[in-house]
Amino acid sequence: MQLSTLTALSPLDGRYQDKVTPLRAIFSEFGLMKFRVAVEVRWLQKLASTADITEVPPFSTQANAFLDGIVANFNEADAARIKEIERTTNHDVKAVEYFLKEKIQNEVELVKVSEFIHFACTSEDINNLSHALMLSTARDEVILPEWQKLIDEITRLAEEYKTIPLLSRTHGQPASPSTVGKEMANVVYRLKRQFKQLQNAEILGKINGAVGNYNAHLSAYPNIDWHKFSEEFVTSLGIQWNPYTTQIEPHDYITEFFDAVVRFNTIIIDFDRDLWGYIALNHFKQRTIAGEIGSSTMPHKVNPIDFENSEGNLGLANAVMTHLGQKLPISRWQRDLTDSTVLRNLGVGLGYCLIAYASTRKGISKLEVNQPHLLEELNQNWEVLAEPIQTVMRRYGIEKPYEKLKELTRGKRVTEQAMREFIDKLDIPQEEKLRLQKLTPATYIGAAVELVEKLS
């Protein structure tokens, strides 16, 4: 059976492959090879730029350009060659080293120093930096831009619907009114916090040998400050340096990275469920799309499938990333290999994220507030004005204001007339009575509009 979108085992590479395309060049095996090649080449160039390593003299402009070209022009044929070499070596990182030696075999200047490719490195020196570059690239080029799109869409809802009143529900029961826009603004604020946390998350790397002590480095060049050398190299890649490790970078930062994504996703799940509920309550209508079918047997159905799809995929994403976050920081003694197979799934959780984010945005694009229904619902719940009335009563020293409103309203459907009559009987200044008489459930929205306007 030929591999295709129809025969792929994972829906990421099958049904949903077009939605995860931006991640394939980063987290596929091709992507991992590309970053490994880049790290190996930059390490060789770093060695050549160090005067104390006389065996690797400074490279000429032509030699550096050739090496830069290997990195910049890395393609699928190169990746296929690495896989071919690996069939002999049975070692993926060693295959990259041999591939690079092949690439430079006709470059006299570089052939002379070919044994300094992968010099003093353990495989994990190359791998951890490659993984760091993968996560950094995905964050900056894919995930944060996707997050910004979602934030922008929900911000648009907040601004568009900032004045449309909404009957709130706490514990599922009618509560003090808000506005549709303010409820969207709450979500935006939460998402922006997580955006900043991922944006500022540290991405760490190390290059310090088989157990983190520069043993091999010092055996060959005991007079070089390898601690400083390591820091310079790691930071030159745009990665923060971790000076204290075993054979592996301990992956704590990966847990922190995925925890931030999981928190963002959890907020979106909350948003998806709220929108699903608002649609069920008829607060929102969904624009229909010609040709779409909601049910195989019930022709009338327009289901909130986009929010459901998002919720489901975010659940998968969070499950994968939570496992990575819990497993990766644990490695026996100076290292075991349990992290290796898990790290090959770095992009899986993020792939499910992309599917979900696209679904949430699609669901948002179909939304249309059902304002007449919202106003009708508010008009049926005059009891929500018990809160402002009893609060004003407290101000003017009326005895047991809460209890009096409780007796009038608790568990009851109160009419406008009943509330007006109650206000008329209050022993409070006339201007306060008039102010309370003007209140309706639709106008009792506090500072909701102003809070939306302050969001930006």
From Swiss-Prot:
Query: Which residues are noted in the entry as N(6)-(1,2-dicarboxyethyl)-AMP-binding?
Result: 15-16, 90-92, 122-123, 247, 296, 301-303, 309, 335, 340-344
- Give the catalysed reaction(s), semicolon-separated: N(6)-(1,2-dicarboxyethyl)-AMP = fumarate + AMP; (2S)-2-[5-amino-1-(5-phospho-beta-D-ribosyl)imidazole-4-carboxamido]succinate = 5-amino-1-(5-phospho-beta-D-ribosyl)imidazole-4-carboxamide + fumarate
GO molecular function: any one? N6-(1,2-dicarboxyethyl)AMP AMP-lyase (fumarate-forming) activity
What's a Pfam family in this record?
A: Lyase_1
The catalytic residues are 171, 295
One GO term under biological process is: 'de novo' AMP biosynthetic process
What EC number(s) is this enzyme filed under? 4.3.2.2
The family database entries (SUPFAM superfamilies) matched by this protein are listed as: L-aspartase-like
Which residues lie in coiled coils? Answer: none
Keywords, in A-Z order: Lyase, Purine biosynthesis
Would I find Lyase among this entry's keywords? yes
Q: In which pathway does it act?
A: Purine metabolism; AMP biosynthesis via de novo pathway; AMP from IMP: step 2/2; Purine metabolism; IMP biosynthesis via de novo pathway; 5-amino-1-(5-phospho-D-ribosyl)imidazole-4-carboxamide from 5-amino-1-(5-phospho-D-ribosyl)imidazole-4-carboxylate: step 2/2
- Keyword Lyase in record: yes
Q: Show the InterPro entries listed in the entry.
A: Fumarase/histidase_N, Fumarate_lyase_CS, Fumarate_lyase_fam, Fumarate_lyase_N, L-Aspartase-like, Pur_lyase, PurB_bact, PurB_C
Q: Which GO terms describe its cellular component?
A: cytosol
Question: How is the subunit organization of this protein annotated in UniProt?
Answer: Homotetramer. Residues from neighboring subunits contribute catalytic and substrate-binding residues to each active site.
* Family in the record: Belongs to the lyase 1 family. Adenylosuccinate lyase subfamily.
**Record function comment:** Catalyzes two reactions in de novo purine nucleotide biosynthesis. Catalyzes the breakdown of 5-aminoimidazole- (N-succinylocarboxamide) ribotide (SAICAR or 2-[5-amino-1-(5-phospho-beta-D-ribosyl)imidazole-4-carboxamido]succinate) to 5-aminoimidazole-4-carboxamide ribotide (AICAR or 5-amino-1-(5-phospho-beta-D-ribosyl)imidazole-4-carboxamide) and fumarate, and of adenylosuccinate (ADS or N(6)-(1,2-dicarboxyethyl)-AMP) to adenosine monophosphate (AMP) and fumarate.
Q: What is this protein called?
A: Adenylosuccinate lyase
**Gene encoding the protein:** purB
